Amino acid sequence: MATLSRMPDERFPRFNRLWTVVALVTVLGLVVGIRIRLLDVPLERDEGEYAYVGQLMLEGVSPYEHVYTMKWPGTHGAYAVIMAVFGQTAAGIHMGLTVITLATALMVFVLARRLAGDFAGVIAAGSYALFSISPSTLGLAAHATHFVVLPALAGILLLQNLDERISALRVFIAGLLLGLAALMKQSGAAFGLFAACWVVWVEIRRPEKHWRRLLLRLGCLALGGLMPLIATCAVLAAFGVFDRFWLWTFHYARAYASIMTLKEGMQLFFQVSEDVFKSAPALWCLSLAGLLLLFCERAMRPWLVFVLGFAGFSFLAICPGLYFRAHYFLLLLPTAALLAGVAASAGLALLARSKFRLNPALLVVLLFCGAGLQMLLKSRDIFFTLSPTRVCMAIHDVNPFPESV
């Protein structure tokens, strides 16, 4: 894999490190503060399902024994772990979600840092943290899509710098993580497909192609990816509920995914996309700018296929069934954050070459902070004023989630 040239933020290492770290710590601290303030928001519908099944699992009851769902049981298991650690309450579940989103922000930082340097990493991580609390994507709730993103990014990170030294074991572990992402929710399998395509692309771009190594890596990736599902099927079979699992998560899920027409799906997509964009227009514009600058910045060209492929398969992950629920868009947030980091780094390069009088890093950080502030102010009542119960009512309208507690 070609090594990227150093990005221009290295021209002011001390100054940039100070301002970028301050900005990142401020944003992450603010986001954590908001999540902690809202720990007691009543569980919504999907959270209630995951929590109930997770609670049954802690009591030794298998999924699909008393509760039927078309979702694979990964997120239910994650809830069981969270409740075992933080308690079987809404606050405990949301504290676990806070840890998950912070870990994901760290993954986004590493991913963007490899692409375009430290500056891009901190802007991308800060962008993800802000995106992840958006009411428009139901980011304050512990949806399965949050749990898909973390292992998916971890697996992709293991494969990002794929060269001759990468062992088959590392590829297998990446497959395990990507398989775990799919176990959290079936649509997470799209990230496994991206990983397979990336492995193929890296190999066929080499001057000397090693087909045996390519087949070995694809085999290890596929084996690792299937292991979580195989293990799950074995456990469910041991509990005597495999037939129910197969009925609900394959037969019923397939029928459910075929209900929506293409026209209806496109209408939903544009409707939800508009709501998501309007919730943080400045941050989304920063991401769109990153998509454009991706083609302009020479240092980014070795990663062009990676970023575009990641974006394309992230979009594919929200498409199954064409339902385009608001929380499906959580799967797009790592891509959006990554592109925001690209925009910041590429913008810094352009400003540095133009001999801009103001410090380029300071200007870009101020622009990012302004974009984040705009998003926070747009939903300020939810983030800073309303009680947890009122927040639930504001986001979910007439759904009686508070009353069901």
Where are these regions (language model features)?
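Transmembrane-helix signature of polytopic, membrane-embedded enzymes
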Residues: W19, V108-F131, V149-L150, A168-R170, ...
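Transmembrane-lumen/periplasm boundary regions of multi-pass, lipid-linked membrane glycan transferases
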Residues: Y50, L180, P207, L214-M300, ...
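Membrane-interface alpha helices of multi-pass inner-membrane proteins
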Residues: R170-Q186, F191-A196, M227, A311-C319
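Membrane-interface transmembrane helices that cradle and orient dolichyl/undecaprenyl
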Residues: G155-I173, V200-P207, A282-W303, A344
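Membrane-proximal, lumen/periplasm-facing interface regions of secretory-pathway glyco-
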Residues: V41-P42, F356-V405
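Hydrophobic/aromatic-rich transmembrane helices and adjacent perimembrane loops
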Residues: A190, F315-L316, L322-L363
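Perimembrane helix-loop-helix junctions
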Residues: R6, E10, F191-L226, L291-A299, ...
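Short hydrophobic alpha-helices at membrane interfaces in multi-pass membrane enzymes
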Residues: N161-G179, K209-C220, P302-G312
